[in-house]
């Protein structure tokens, strides 16, 4: 599992994300309420931004390459590849 720190508007939370599990699924299992809509990487409701670490979001993404290079991730499809620090609730920053 990878140690993942979620920086949310209501505080900072740390959870362990099992290998192969998305950030959104792991957060929900731990009882954290993150925003989401489609759960399929096809919208930006669950958008977060990676502060440190890396994720795999190759399952298909609403984001373009430039947005991904800036660190934006869709938590519903993003699977940690290392320990992570991620800011959640970032949808309004995209537009």
Swiss-Prot record:
Cofactor binding note from Swiss-Prot or TrEMBL: Binds 1 [2Fe-2S] cluster.
Cell location: Plastid, Chloroplast
One GO CC term, this protein: chloroplast
Domain 2Fe-2S ferredoxin-type: 2-92
GO terms assigned for molecular function: 2 iron, 2 sulfur cluster binding; electron transfer activity; metal ion binding
Positions annotated to bind [2Fe-2S] cluster: 38, 43, 46, 76
Pfam families tied to this protein: Fer2
InterPro entries on file: 2Fe-2S_ferredoxin-like_sf, 2Fe-2S_ferredoxin-type, 2Fe2S_fd_BS, Beta-grasp_dom_sf, Fd_pln
Cofactor: [2Fe-2S] cluster
Keyword terms, alphabetized: 2Fe-2S, Chloroplast, Electron transport, Iron, Iron-sulfur, Metal-binding, Plastid, Transport
Superkingdom field: Eukaryota
Principal location class: plastid
Any single biological process term in GO: electron transport chain
Keyword match Oxidoreductase: no
Similarity section: Belongs to the 2Fe2S plant-type ferredoxin family.
Protein role: Ferredoxins are iron-sulfur proteins that transfer electrons in a wide variety of metabolic reactions.
Protein name (database record): Ferredoxin-1
Natural source organism: Equisetum telmateia (Great horsetail)
């Amino acid at each position: 599992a990878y140690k993942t720190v979620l920086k949310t508007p209501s505080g900072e939370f740390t959870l362990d994300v099992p290998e192969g599990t998305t950030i959104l699924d792991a957060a929900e299992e731990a009882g954290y309420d993150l925003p989401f809509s489609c759960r399929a990487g096809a919208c930006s409701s669950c958008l977060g931004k990676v502060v440190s670490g890396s994720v795999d979001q190759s399952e298909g993404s609403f984001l373009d390459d430039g947005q991904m290079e800036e660190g934006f991730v869709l938590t519903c499809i993003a699977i940690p590849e290392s320990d992570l620090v991620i800011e959640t609730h970032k949808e309004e920053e995209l537009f």
